From Swiss-Prot:
The lineage of its organism: Archaea, Methanobacteriati, Methanobacteriota, Methanomada group, Methanopyri. This is Phosphoribosyl-ATP pyrophosphatase. GO terms for molecular function: ATP binding; phosphoribosyl-ATP diphosphatase activity. The keyword Transcription does not apply. Belongs to the PRA-PH family. It comes from Methanopyrus kandleri (strain AV19 / DSM 6324 / JCM 9639 / NBRC 100938). It is an enzyme of class 3 (hydrolase). The gene is hisE.
Length: 100
């Protein structure tokens, strides 16, 4: 099984890309308002898209697809959290609260 710490590492990279806005960064582009739509809309649309792809993979019994699309969905949720200034630790705290 992989190391769950990778979520923290990915979250930090996302935060850095939002703050530093390096040219050519997918995260920087996704989290920037443009002429056609606000960043929050772009992020939420990606989450909807990835959710749908995950559902279809699950419905089709595509185990590899479920893993792939779950990763895409989790990544975009991490982008949303970072964009909104929500620390990933807040989500971990909520999981712990619900576990009790």
């Amino acid at each position: 099984m992989g190391d769950p710490e990778v979520l923290l590492e990915v979250y930090e990279v996302i935060r850095n890309r939002i703050e530093e806005r390096p040219e050519g960064s997918y995260v920087a582009e996704l989290t920037e308002d443009d002429d056609t739509k606000p960043a929050i809309n772009k992020i939420c649309e990606k989450i909807i898209e990835e959710s749908g792809e995950l559902i279809l993979a699950a419905k089709d019994g595509d185990r590899e697809g479920v893993v792939y699309e779950s990763t895409d969905l989790i990544f975009h949720v991490l982008v949303l959290l970072a964009y909104l200034g929500i620390e990933i630790g807040e989500v971990f705290d909520e999981f712990e609260r619900r576990r009790k």
